Amino acid sequence: ASDVYKRQNLAAVIDPGDEPELIQEALEKEGVEVRYLLLTHGHYDHTTAVPALHRVYPQADIYIHQADANGAGSTLFPLTGEVDDLKLYDEGDVIRLGDHEIQVLHTPGHSPGSVTLKVEDVLFTGDTLFAGSCGRTDLRGGSYEQIMQSLKRLGELKGDFHVCPGHEATSTLERERRSNPFLMEAMRS
């Protein structure tokens, strides 16, 4: 699964996990200039299409959090050795796309370098927050305590947001505050 955030004929592709040809076809149909490939974390199901897309869009900067940039050869982190010009982002960084700002929130737990990308009233949560659930923490580098802290942080954001997770259905933050058992538990702590 991947998301495309577009503004003023510019695009950021978020978590291009597979099917680079379909992503490219959609981007060409939209007639946008791809500026960024933004990764919420480094697992293969969010990064597999990156090398192919970067060959087509070499001008696009690839961003990932430092904690997931060095995959140490794990099959979960296939970018290691395939893409050598990764740019690193961290908590508080801002990526500009036209006149819009994409804010980086470090939300570890699913992986050490998991981030949520906040832009306008949208949260691209990767595998941190799902509709009705949260990402698994039993993979290498995962931490239940950290994901609960990250969920609490997201739940405490002021206002409502559209939630675009890395898998399954979209939601709203307000709906998740009322019905997601993991988010509700995190906010009680």
Task: Give the label of every model feature segment.
Residues 1-5:
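Short, small-residue-biased leader/transition segments that mark boundaries at the very start
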Residues 6-10, 94-103, 118-121:
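Beta-strand-turn-beta hairpins that frame and shape the catalytic cleft
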Residues 7-16, 30, 74-79, 101-106, 111-189:
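Metallo-beta-lactamase
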Residues 8, 32, 58-59, 119-122, ...:
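Short glycine/proline-enriched coil/turn segments at helix->beta-strand junctions
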Residues 12, 38, 62, 124, ...:
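Residue-level marker for buried hydrophobic side chains located in beta-strands
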Residues 13-14, 39-40, 83, 105-106, ...:
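Short, flexible loop segments at the rims of nucleotide/cofactor-binding pockets, characterized by
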Residues 18-100, 178-185:
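Active-site HxH/HxHxD metal-binding segment of metal-dependent hydrolases
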